[in-house]
Structures are given as C-alpha cells and as structure tokens.
C-alpha cells in the first residue's frame, strides 16, 4: 500500500441531497445506507476513487473488490449493526459454513480490507486493515471460530 494513503478516514454524504436526487425520503436513504448488502456498491466506488486511487475488480465474483494504484487487491466490508466477517463471501449465508483453509487462502490473495462503519452514516468512518493484521487477530483468538465479530469488537480492535 502506498505510504501517502491515509489508513483511516471518513466518507461523508449529504442525506437531504441524496434523498432529493433519488426522489426518496430521508428515512429510506438512511435505511439503504445502513444495509451492507445494498451500500457496498457505493462504498466500493468511493473507496476505489477517493482512497485507493485504483480500479474496480473486473467482475463481482473476482474474490476482491478493488485493485489499488500499486496493483494490490482489497476487499471492502461493512461494519453493520450485526458486525463484520472476514471469510470469503462464499462462506457466508444460509447453509454455508466457515472453512479455515479457505479463509487463510483468501487472506494470502489480498492486501487486506477496508472496513466501513455504516452504522455511523451519514459520516462513515473507514479503516484500512492489512491481511497480516487480520491473521494476527485470528491467531490471537480475536476473530472467534468463524471470523465474524460484533460491531463493538471490531471498533475495539480498530481503536488499538
């Protein structure tokens, strides 16, 4: 990662202008922007252009979201009211299960994660966390058995 890039920052939105532009209510804007499945599209694009100054992955199934200006691959993840997970997306959801080897393989293929606290919308703080940081958290037991942690735990780890 380029040293001139900040490791933290804040993405800001004007809720009223977004609501007006989309012709929806302010409440609907808040609901949309605090749903990680929905807002990820927008977060990936803003992080790509404003923070990593790179390009988006060629496809949704690429295994990463952004290629930075140095060629490093990054995942963008939302810290929602339900927390955040670090395992590959194919391990998350109904009927799917965590697999340690796939998790560690994923970490070997990316530079790390950009974690966005969507619960703080309209000013969403983000943190750039390297894969080696995640591996350290894993080995110290901070990520539990399936690499999903609560929002509170994520914010505590990020504040260290």
What kind of region is each of these model predictions?
Residues 1-160:
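Nucleic-acid endonuclease domains
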């Amino acid at each position: 990662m380029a040293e001139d890039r900040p490791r933290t920052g804040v993405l800001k939105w004007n809720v009223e202008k977004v609501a007006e532009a989309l012709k929806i209510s302010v409440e609907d804007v808040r609901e949309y922007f605090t749903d990680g499945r929905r807002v990820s599209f927008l977060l990936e694009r803003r992080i790509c252009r404003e923070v990593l100054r790179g390009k988006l992955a060629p496809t949704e199934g690429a295994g990463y979201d952004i290629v930075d200006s140095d060629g490093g691959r990054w995942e963008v993840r939302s810290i929602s009211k339900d927390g955040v997970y670090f395992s590959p997306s194919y391990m998350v959801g109904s009927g799917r299960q965590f697999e340690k080897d796939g998790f560690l393989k994923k970490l070997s293929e990316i530079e790390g994660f950009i974690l966005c606290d969507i619960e703080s919308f309209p000013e969403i703080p983000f943190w750039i966390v390297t894969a080696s940081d995640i591996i350290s958290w894993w080995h110290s037991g901070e990520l539990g058995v399936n690499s999903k942690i609560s929002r509170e735990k994520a914010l505590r780890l990020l504040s260290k």
